Amino acid sequence: MAPADARLHTSYAQFPSPDGYGTVRGYLAQPAKSKGKLPTVLVVHENRGLNPHIEDIVRRLALDDFIAFAPDALFPLGGYPGDEDKARELFGKLDQAKTREDFLAAEDFLKHRPEGNGKVGVVGFCWGGGIANFLATRVPDLGAAVPFYGAQPPAEDVAKIKAPLLCSTPARTNASMPAGPRTSRR
């Protein structure tokens, strides 16, 4: 989908993250013509940063009448470098505790968007799946979490999850999931 699609308003947004790296920057998209307050989706990239593919996902969600936002975890280190291998190398330099705080700030940013309905869901891919799981353990009123792979939360944090989850994991990853109630449909 073209970045300049007339059906959408897109921009890069920045806001403070006092407990994280100080500032979060990411890609924001919403329908150009919407009626009423919209639900919001936090899109969390894999260990490659905010690349064109993730920006495309944000735009596609906006076409489905969501306000979507994808923070760039690599912003504190200069942002997505345009090269997937270099991006992966940069991930090793991130302070993960600060990065997690940045994603908590991003969830709060979306929750308080004036054009939003106050409900936030999160979808994360690979590394971002771990962030989606983390947010599910830390945000009691999270609307939903959809992790595609990613690190599982510690077993002691599973009981804190109140949001509906839709988890996509390969069979060998399921072995790492904490024991607990599960529902599986095929």
Where is each model-derived feature located?
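A short beta-to-alpha transition loop/helix N-cap that caps and shapes the active-site region
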Residues: 76-81, 152-158, 175-176
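Short, thiol/selenol-centered motifs that function as redox-active sites or metal-ligating centers
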Residues: 46, 125-126, 170
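Active-site-adjacent alpha-helix of alpha/beta-hydrolase-fold enzymes
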Residues: 60-63, 174-186
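N-terminal targeting or regulatory segments adjacent to alpha/beta-hydrolase or S9 domains
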Residues: 1-14
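Short beta-strand/loop motif that positions the catalytic acidic residue
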Residues: 161, 167-169
